[in-house]
Amino acid sequence: YDTAPGDLWEQERIHALKEEVEASGLHISGIESVNIHDAIKIGLPERDRYIENYIRTLENLGKEDIHMVCYNFMPVFDWTRTELARVRPDGSTVLAYSQKAIDALDPEKMFDSISGDSNGYVMPGWEPERMAKIKELFTLYRDVDEEKLFSNLKYFLEAIMPVCNRYDIRMAIHPDD
């Protein structure tokens, strides 16, 4: 979906998307992903404004009979892989992650490395406009350790769960988190 993290998903746009999908004979039963703004993950003072937009987005999804939202709470990137096409012994390819490779790269080199393997495909969380701010994001996340990130996730979930319960929305966190 083309709405920036933290921005409201308007009900009219959700409805139009749902109609377009259903006109093709399909049904939307869930959404991946209503992206979470970094201010929420970091715990910045402005996070409540973005949480309010998230709550209103959930209400709009619920009103459109969409009852599952997959999301992630990963810092900096939507997801991180160090290889997009690691060759397996049988010749197939898989995504791969190496902490050693992450530790050895600075953010710009990492972006260049991943982008070079992407064949021009822009991956979620790796958009060029986001990458222009990557050093700033790394600085903002510098003091967010595992405990702080989990505390911010708990704060977020406690804020959104009442509306999830009201609209029977199941929140499905990405398994990498």
Model-derived regions, located:
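N-terminal pre-domain/capping segments
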Residues: 1-168, 172
